[in-house]
């Protein structure tokens, strides 16, 4: 599978992809995937690296009052987003797909989302009150539903 094949497989569902995915996230991932394959990085290592970025983003968002941390959180989430696509592309490119890898990917995604919402909640609730937790729970529920719907549409 060549460079173009990696890009095509990542954009096979264009109608459900966002502009940033199509024009930034997937193209960067399509360039990174063959490099990681040559370096013999495992898809699960990519998933876990993405999860580490997500957890660090949650910590950075907890400190969002300092604009440097807010920017760091954003940058870490962009890296997570790229790695979240690369792990599957790498698994397909190197023929290392597995059910265990899918589970690791799902856990990594959920740990990332919980980390971000938790970081924001811990930062905002002392200032704005406990209603922040209800709002974040609602946002997390909506996010989970959107992610599940996206995955179902992507697999069709």
Predicted regions: what they are:
Residues 2-33, 110-156:
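A feature for the membrane-embedded catalytic helix bundles of lipid/isoprenoid biosynthetic enzymes
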